[in-house]
């Protein structure tokens, strides 16, 4: 069994499309540009870190890059038995296994990015990864902060992401270090994702998902 796991927002980096520019799979970038009305190629080739940090750009480029890599792998005759994803990567996985068509996937990711960008503008926030504490200790750090900060992702043993207001995350970071965290790393994202700060995006995204009409896949 071959399983593919697709990444979420925050994995983007400047120039990440350059190794793929002359590959056949680059045609997906051109298709995504036509569907979205955005120059996805320019974002993948030339955008700086701040431009890619914009939620609208980060989600679209990560989604398209992931499917471009998948296309290249499938051209070698390898196909996944199972697809899964982390946050945004769930949408990539749904497209990879045929539950969403590529067009619908691009449009849905654009809507998701726009909705989350707007929510992040209304309620500015940040995210950080806490390394070296167990889940309970990170939760304690958030409670001790007594501010708008929550556990957003339980990524792995000893790696938990917190998110919230800049002040809340700063306070929780202080408490996490006092509890013995090895490191607290700010993430290159432009919002407090997976928290109540994203409530404004929820209803808009629910409608977009229904309109996309995901289908059952084998």
PLM-predicted stretches and their roles:
Residues 9-11, 36, 97-218:
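Alpha/beta catalytic cores of group-transfer enzymes, especially the acyltransferase/condensing modules
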């Amino acid at each position: 069994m071959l399983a593919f796991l697709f990444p979420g927002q925050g994995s983007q980096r400047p120039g990440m499309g350059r190794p793929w520019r002359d590959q056949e799979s680059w045609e997906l970038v051109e298709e995504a540009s036509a569907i979205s009305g955005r120059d996805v190629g320019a974002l993948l080739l030339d955008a700086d870190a701040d431009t890619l940090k914009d939620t609208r750009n980060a989600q679209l480029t990560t989604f398209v890059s992931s499917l471009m890599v998948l296309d290249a792998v499938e051209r070698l005759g390898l196909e996944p038995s199972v697809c899964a994803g982390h946050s945004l990567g769930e949408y990539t996985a749904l497209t990879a296994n045929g539950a969403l068509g590529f067009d619908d996937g691009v449009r849905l990711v654009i809507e998701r990015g726009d909705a989350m960008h707007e929510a992040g503008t209304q309620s500015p926030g940040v995210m950080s990864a806490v390394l070296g504490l167990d889940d309970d200790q990170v939760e304690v750090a958030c409670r001790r902060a007594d501010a708008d900060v929550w556990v957003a992702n339980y990524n792995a043993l000893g790696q938990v992401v917190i998110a919230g207001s800049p002040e809340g995350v700063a306070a929780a970071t202080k408490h996490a270090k006092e509890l013995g965290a090895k490191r607290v790393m700010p993430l290159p994202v432009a919002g407090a994702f997976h928290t109540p700060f994203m409530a404004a995006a929820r209803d808009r995204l629910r409608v977009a998902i229904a309109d996309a009409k995901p289908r059952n896949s084998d």
